[in-house]
């Protein structure tokens, strides 16, 4: 491996001859950067949810890495382990495609080989149930997912991170209740969901078919 700053390293399985060939041919060569786990020292007023949000790491993953803590009574001055960001990217990375989402702008952009393809109006999670900024990847495809806790059918669902073990947040089309009532069509472009990224039905189907498992999804505040 090759050491970088802050303990990061480059992937171990690259062939230097491939790198040289790419350079000679003016081609692109993608490296994978491995991030180490980090330590965070609890400060006055910290809550685990706010630490998780700032660390761009799901709450439950920090809790799992620190099984002895009481999340409702953090001890000021104690150290927490923040898991490696690479744990959020478990699949082989699709390097030539990327999805970028802005919570502030309520927009999504798709890129291929570094070139902008499309821009979409979206809705992310409301402040009480926010979408978590961070770098993730498409991990699941489900033509119609169902969230029983909210009675929501979610078409063309792409799972990108687990808000809690087994509970996926993702990208999908406008959801419907079991009664057939469609939600949030009139508020696209504003925060509306329980944490997922919502799109109109046609756009969601297009993204579903375009983004295979492994495509990186970058969510910015």
Task: State each model region's role.
Residues 64, 148-221:
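Exported/periplasmic cell-wall-interacting domains
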